[in-house]
Amino acid sequence: MNNIQIFKIELNNYRQFQGVEEISLETSPDKHINVIEGQNGSGKSNILNAITLCFYNEEPHIDDSNDRGLGADPVANLKELEAIDVGESVRGHIEITLGKDEPQYIFTRKFRTAKVDDDEYNSVIEDLQLRQKFGADWQNVENPNTRLREILPTRVHHTVS
């Protein structure tokens, strides 16, 4: 499949993105590129992290050092986590809509972050899910990782990360 484009990314309680945030990335014949700009800490790198987490269950652009860098933060939005009690959790998801001329696939990866202590969290990332458009209907697809490799070969992932 050639000319796959991401139409939309929906982030729900993912890192800096509190609540549901939709990022439209549709192109048109006269608009072939999207530019994402913003101040440091506004979430630009985490948009790329969200894509790789959704597709490949990896966040290669996270700083894994122990100096409270991004890698030290929970997957779920920190403001949402601060508002809950120990033992409760915040749920979220990353949803990516892509296709050729129109949306054909919706990949979703859900997560849950539990508040273990006031400054300690535990995140669980669920398996990848896929809905594919057949005619006018959207249907769940078994083995979404296999379909993902057909749409976006592994070499594409390694080029990005």
Report each predicted region and the residues it spans.
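Short polybasic amphipathic segments
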Residues: 9, 90-97, 117-134
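Generic structural motif
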Residues: 14, 28-30, 99-101, 112-114, ...
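Pre-Walker A-like glycine/lysine-rich segment at the N-terminus of P-loop NTPase domains
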Residues: 1-56
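Short, surface-exposed linear segments at secondary-structure transitions and domain or protein termini
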Residues: 28-32, 113-127, 147-159
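N-terminal intrinsically disordered, low-complexity tails enriched in polar/charged
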Residues: 1-9, 133-148
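A general secondary-structure signal for short beta-strands and their flanking turns/coil
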Residues: 3-4, 20, 87-91, 104, ...
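Intrinsic disorder/low-complexity detector
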Residues: 36, 42, 48, 120-124, ...
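Conserved P-loop NTP-binding catalytic core
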Residues: 37, 48-116, 138-156
